């Protein structure tokens, strides 16, 4: 069943998206930066309708606290949590950096 939840991309995740876009701009130009930012935001918007499409976070401490991990594409993933009818996105990171710490 499709749900219609609220999606809140928290400031640390917004900063991550900005940093990712800046990185893409530095190596491939503005169109690449816009494309990756759009791809990430479009993927995150899927969580509004399908909040459990990500997996339980692979870090046991984060999993116990209800955090989930959603693979955006082959390079990036987000850490998020569903509280009632709201999806909170905490971080967007390079897949290999997704470790315990400050939710990244």
Regions found by a protein language model. Give the residues of each.
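Residue-level signal for well-ordered alpha-helical scaffold segments within enzymatic catalytic domains
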Residues: 19-22, 46, 81, 91
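A short linear boundary/processing microfeature
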Residues: 23-26, 53, 95
């Amino acid at each position: 069943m499709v749900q219609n939840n609220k999606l809140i991309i928290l400031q640390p995740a917004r900063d991550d998206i900005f940093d990712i876009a800046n990185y893409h701009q530095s190596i491939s130009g503005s169109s690449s930066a816009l494309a990756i930012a759009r791809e990430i935001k479009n993927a995150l918007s899927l969580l509004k309708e399908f909040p459990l499409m990500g997996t339980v976070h692979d870090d046991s401490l984060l999993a116990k606290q209800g955090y989930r991990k959603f693979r955006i594409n082959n390079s990036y993933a987000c850490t998020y949590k569903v509280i009632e009818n709201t999806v909170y996105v905490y971080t967007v990171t390079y897949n290999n950096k997704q470790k315990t710490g400050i939710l990244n």
